[in-house]
Amino acid sequence: MSQSTPLTVFVLSDSVGQTALQLAQAALAQYPNVKPDIIRFPFVHSVDKLTDVLSKAVPEETIVVHTLATTGLSEIAQNYCDAKKIASFDMMSPLTKLITAKTSLAPSGEAGALHHLNDRYFDRISAMEFAVMYDDGKDPHGFLEADIVLLGVSRTSKTPLSLFLANRNIKVANLPIVPQAHIPDEIWHVDPKKIIGLMNTPEVLNNIRRERMIAYGLNPDTTYSDMDEIKAELDFAQDLYDKIGCQVINVANRSIEETAAIILEQTGLDFASSSTDHVN
């Protein structure tokens, strides 16, 4: 069996980055002996963020591909890569130059302009992708980009709430809270007004967790559903929320819709999202 060749590919975009990701994956599929490590960097809107991302690229090991529509960013990316001898490919500029040559019209230079085919619909898709990408603390950088950050111990409805709010075009990241676990540094750089600490009563949480274990065909009497452990988790979470200074919502016996409505009201996003309610 031939040995696989490793290759790191940075995918940069000032929008979600799905287009660049799919094109990169299609090209890499032509090389079965290449073992790619594809790292996506979405929502690269500023020069500072762009250079910060590019500074992580190792010239001998990395290819940078990008779809940067924001005016000036693609040129800055190309100049940086040329100077550092980093292999790069601009997926956007060659085609926009051809279109300009044929039409004598300049591109808008606006990130995610494709979304304007139906702003509200595509904004919703973007928010959904954001919620999935930054669910369960997968990438701490998402906390800095989110409209709302949800914190909570296991089974406090973090993921369902994230997806429900994403359906209102709101970018949500969430983080599971586990006693003594490291809290990402990014959390302390988020405006506390954007952070919601989710709580529950020990009794309700105990019932939910026991039912969850039974549904999986497992023994419901474990540390996960132990009342003392649950109380310790909730105490740890409350102490963390107090340190952060964030708003706290008890989700006990509340529907996802009811909790989401409280979150929107407390964060002031209820009016901003209301115009999207009737999109088909």
Swiss-Prot record:
Its EC number is 2.7.11.32, 2.7.4.27. InterPro entries: Kinase-pyrophosphorylase, PPDK_reg. Keywords: Kinase, Nucleotide-binding, Serine/threonine-protein kinase, Transferase. ADP binds at residues 152-159. This is Putative pyruvate, phosphate dikinase regulatory protein 1. The keyword Membrane does not apply. Belongs to the pyruvate, phosphate/water dikinase regulatory protein family. PDRP subfamily. Transmembrane segments: none annotated. It comes from the Bacteria. Bifunctional serine/threonine kinase and phosphorylase involved in the regulation of the pyruvate, phosphate dikinase (PPDK) by catalyzing its phosphorylation/dephosphorylation. It holds the Pfam family Kinase-PPPase. It catalyses: N(tele)-phospho-L-histidyl/L-threonyl-[pyruvate, phosphate dikinase] + ADP = N(tele)-phospho-L-histidyl/O-phospho-L-threonyl-[pyruvate, phosphate dikinase] + AMP + H(+); N(tele)-phospho-L-histidyl/O-phospho-L-threonyl-[pyruvate, phosphate dikinase] + phosphate + H(+) = N(tele)-phospho-L-histidyl/L-threonyl-[pyruvate, phosphate dikinase] + diphosphate. It comes from Latilactobacillus sakei subsp. sakei (strain 23K) (Lactobacillus sakei subsp. sakei). GO terms for molecular function: ADP binding; ATP binding; phosphotransferase activity, phosphate group as acceptor; protein serine/threonine kinase activity.
